UniProtKB/Swiss-Prot annotation:
Name this protein carries in UniProt: Large-conductance mechanosensitive channel
Species this chain originates from: Xylella fastidiosa (strain 9a5c)
Subunit organization: Homopentamer.
Compartments, record wording: Cell inner membrane
Gene from which the chain derives: mscL
NCBIfam families: mscL, PRK00567.1-4
């Protein structure tokens, strides 16, 4: 089997295509959640707690200075506000996935299982049993 044909069979499997679609949809969903958190939820929470912009929250470890040559040495800062926004995004995405999985499980569990058809062996044994009863 040629390398190209093997690759084509690999790519055309249902699982690979499903995974590719899921990755694309997941990336788009991530952008939506990022916009939701950055532009709507974080500002609302900031207003509720006194006008704080979470993305700007930081801890300055060392202030900016000017060295002997007159060049500015930037401050050493831990920007934990963006980290808080990322945690909030994660929680929202995890909750959305939880809801989706819960709905899928509900649909799967609601579908009645098709009646199991007995195998030929079982049918033959039943026929023998019924004929012996007579």
């Amino acid at each position: 089997m040629s390398f190209i044909r093997e690759f084509k069979e690999f790519v055309m499997r249902g699982n690979v295509i499903d995974l590719a679609v899921a990755v694309v949809i997941g990336a788009a969903f991530g952008k939506i959640v990022t916009a939701l958190v950055d532009k709507i939820i974080s500002p609302l929470i900031g207003v509720m707690v006194g006008g704080i912009d979470f993305s700007k929250l930081s801890l300055t470890l060392k202030a900016a200075t000017v060295d002997a040559a007159g060049k500015e040495v930037p401050a050493v800062v831990i920007g934990y506000g963006d980290f808080l926004n990322t945690i909030l995004q994660f929680i929202i995405i995890a909750f959305a996935i939880f809801i989706i999985v819960k709905m899928i499980n509900k649909v799967i569990n609601k579908q009645p299982l098709p009646p199991e058809t007995p195998s030929e062996d079982v049918l033959l044994l039943r026929e023998i049993r019924d004929s012996l009863k007579k």
